[in-house]
Regions:
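N-terminal secretory signal peptides that target proteins for export/translocation
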Residues: 1-2
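Sec-dependent N-terminal signal peptides
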Residues: 5-14
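Intrinsically disordered, low-complexity serine/threonine-rich segments
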Residues: 9, 22-25
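C-terminal motif of bacterial Sec signal peptides marking the signal peptidase cleavage site
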Residues: 16-19
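Non-cytosolic coordination micro-motifs
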Residues: 24-78, 113-199
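Compositionally biased P/S/T/G-rich terminal and signal peptide-adjacent segments
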Residues: 24-36, 82-107
């Protein structure tokens, strides 16, 4: 009897050990194979993710880098910038159309580089080119999603609490036109408090 109990306990410990060491997180909608990078970039044009930066400083800093602030497209937390001299600008050796900044209060939370097209095939080609460039620097974590508006998505997770998400997705413009976006978003959890589950 003791021998059977010992075997049962060993079997349960083995199952628990195996399930705890899995790198996959599974839900009904998505599966994520997690890979962590030591650090993901957190500074862009002199602005650091997670830092408290007033709106006027963000606007002046980016204007000095050749961008203009699209006030008519921005809100208090979502700031839209475009290149002053042409339709495109470069970052990381790649060409982009749009730069969007997200903040909560005065804390800089994310920086989004984005391109837009009406053609899914060319957007997926752009996605794959960006993916190859980013993966020369970071190891990916790929997510499988059932969201029909997302054609491809890859995460780059940093132990420094900064992550990047590369996505190719469908969206509708204000004028009700369907577009395909390709975005590279750097975002942080710095300064965010864990959710409190107390009532």
């Amino acid at each position: 009897m003791k021998n059977k109990m010992f075997i049962l306990i060993c079997l349960l410990v083995g199952i628990a050990f195996n399930s705890c060491n899995s790198n996959k997180t599974i839900s009904s909608k998505e599966q994520l194979d997690t890979v962590w990078n030591d650090k993901v970039q957190d500074s862009f044009y002199g602005l650091v993710l997670g830092n408290t930066i007033p709106l006027a400083v963000i606007v002046k800093t980016l204007e000095n880098q050749g961008f203009y602030y699209g006030r008519q497209y921005s809100s208090g937390e979502n700031l839209c910038f475009r290149a002053q001299q042409s339709r495109y600008f470069t970052f990381g050796g790649l060409t982009w159309e749009m730069l969007n900044i997200e903040r909560h209060g005065d804390v800089l939370n994310s920086v989004c580089f984005m391109n837009s097209s009406i053609d899914k095939a060319s957007s997926l080609g752009i996605y794959n080119n960006i993916k190859a460039a980013v993966e020369a620097k970071y190891s990916p974590s790929t997510i499988i999603t059932t969201d029909t508006t997302v054609y491809a998505r890859t995460y780059y997770l940093g132990r420094n609490r900064v992550c990047a998400t590369l996505s190719c997705f469908r969206y509708e413009t204000i004028g009700r036109k369907i577009m395909i976006g390709t975005s590279l978003v750097y975002w942080t959890k710095k300064g965010k408090k864990a959710a409190n589950d107390e009532l």
